[in-house]
Amino acid sequence: MRVVLAGGGTAGHVEPALALADALRRINPDTQVLCLGTKRGLEQRLVPMRGYELAEIPAVPLPRKLTPQLLSVPGRLANAISTAAKHLDRVQADILVGFGGYVATPGYLAARSRRIPIVVHEANPLPGLANRLGARLTPHVFTGHPHTEIRNGRYIGIPLRTRISNLDRLAVGDKARSKFGLRPDLPTLLIFGGSQGAQAINQAAFDSAEDFYQAGIQVLHVVGPKNADGPEDRTRGGVPYVVVPYVDEMELAYAAADIAMCRSGALTCAELTAVGLPAVFVPLAIGNGEQRLNAEPIVQAGGGLMVANSELSRDWIREHLIPLLTDTDRIVAMSEAAARLGRRDADMALAREVIAIARGERPTPEMPIDYSEESGDTR
């Protein structure tokens, strides 16, 4: 089977696509995978690193408002569609799976022009423009959030790397802490802000360094590649404050931590619940509040806290986060609550759907594919 994946720009688009690719290869090692991407997205690094072919197509941002940029969209979009179609023809694609982002729209339209089956995966509660368009071109639409309102949508979860979905935090916790230069006997806070970091989170954490030292809380702080500054004295009284620009093995960062403080993108929320790591969510106030909607079910279930970006401060951390990190029983309860919301099998579930659709065996809503272990998924 020859599969083309269209999803680039951010980790939230790229990582689920690659997790699906891995699952398809586990089912059939002969599956051919081509990823469509842009010149500037994270896919430039992640796709080759994971062993897949990347084909570039022009990025075509769709303006949300009436601006002069709208005049250039038809010509640029036509060029991107033509480029995507050439790649589909070159690999003789059997199916295209889109995950949103700038490359998804040309991918959907190119596949439609070639009568190639289309699958849409929308990770967020509020679907983006590209996937709303894609959902009009196919009945095969799957969502990462149970309450996403999109045409033909069926909840399936967000595909995750097996390093995340198979992670046993307790089993590898001490090894993970040793890797990052952390002690095995102290409560541990993991701070990160997504692939590029988050200035507000970084600053509030740095401002609170003295409070973490005094409370005996060690910190693993992933600041982002452009934000390598941090407390000058990073270990005090034997309490580490480890600052790193980026972590490729994020599963080890999760294993090292008792609690995370982070943004609440759809992929982040899916990973944290899959591994049962409670979090303080600091939603990025963008778009229609997608990040807040991602975190709300976890917070309501008792698996996390949420604070507005504008309200995060040293005082808030001192009042809410530090007492939590020193309350072992509460951390255990929050971890269990988060884990109850996690879905670890979405990669295999979506892979089976893609295979069935490519073969013309799409199940109806009344006769869904059985994703239980009895159906052959024995990971």
Curated annotation (Swiss-Prot):
Q: Which pathway is this protein assigned to?
A: Cell wall biogenesis; peptidoglycan biosynthesis
Q: Name one Pfam family in it.
A: Glyco_tran_28_C
Kindly list the GO molecular function terms attached to this UniProt entry.
Answer: UDP-N-acetyl-D-glucosamine:N-acetylmuramoyl-L-alanyl-D-glutamyl-meso-2,6-diaminopimelyl-D-alanyl-D-alanine-diphosphoundecaprenol 4-beta-N-acetylglucosaminlytransferase activity; undecaprenyldiphospho-muramoylpentapeptide beta-N-acetylglucosaminyltransferase activity
Catalytic activity reported: di-trans,octa-cis-undecaprenyl diphospho-N-acetyl-alpha-D-muramoyl-L-alanyl-D-glutamyl-meso-2,6-diaminopimeloyl-D-alanyl-D-alanine + UDP-N-acetyl-alpha-D-glucosamine = di-trans,octa-cis-undecaprenyl diphospho-[N-acetyl-alpha-D-glucosaminyl-(1->4)]-N-acetyl-alpha-D-muramoyl-L-alanyl-D-glutamyl-meso-2,6-diaminopimeloyl-D-alanyl-D-alanine + UDP + H(+)
Residues given in the record as UDP-N-acetyl-alpha-D-glucosamine binding sites = 10-12, 124, 161, 195, 291
| Thylakoid as UniProt keyword | no
* Listed InterPro entries: GlcNAc_MurG, Glyco_trans_28_C, GlycoTrans_28_N
UniProt keyword annotation of Lipid metabolism present? no
Primary localization: membrane
Write down the top EC class of this protein: transferase
Keywords in alphabetical order, please. Answer: Cell cycle, Cell division, Cell membrane, Cell shape, Cell wall biogenesis/degradation, Glycosyltransferase, Membrane, Peptidoglycan synthesis, Transferase
Q: Name one GO biological process term.
A: lipid glycosylation
Where does it live in the cell?
Answer: Cell membrane
Q: Which GO terms describe its cellular component?
A: plasma membrane
- Topology with regard to the membrane? Peripheral membrane protein
Q: What is its EC number?
A: 2.4.1.227
What is this protein's function per UniProt?
Cell wall formation. Catalyzes the transfer of a GlcNAc subunit on undecaprenyl-pyrophosphoryl-MurNAc-pentapeptide (lipid intermediate I) to form undecaprenyl-pyrophosphoryl-MurNAc-(pentapeptide)GlcNAc (lipid intermediate II).
What family is this? Belongs to the glycosyltransferase 28 family. MurG subfamily.
Q: What HAMAP family does this protein map onto? A: MurG
Q: Which protein is depicted?
A: UDP-N-acetylglucosamine--N-acetylmuramyl-(pentapeptide) pyrophosphoryl-undecaprenol N-acetylglucosamine transferase
- Species, as recorded: Thermobifida fusca (strain YX)
Q: Which gene encodes it?
A: murG
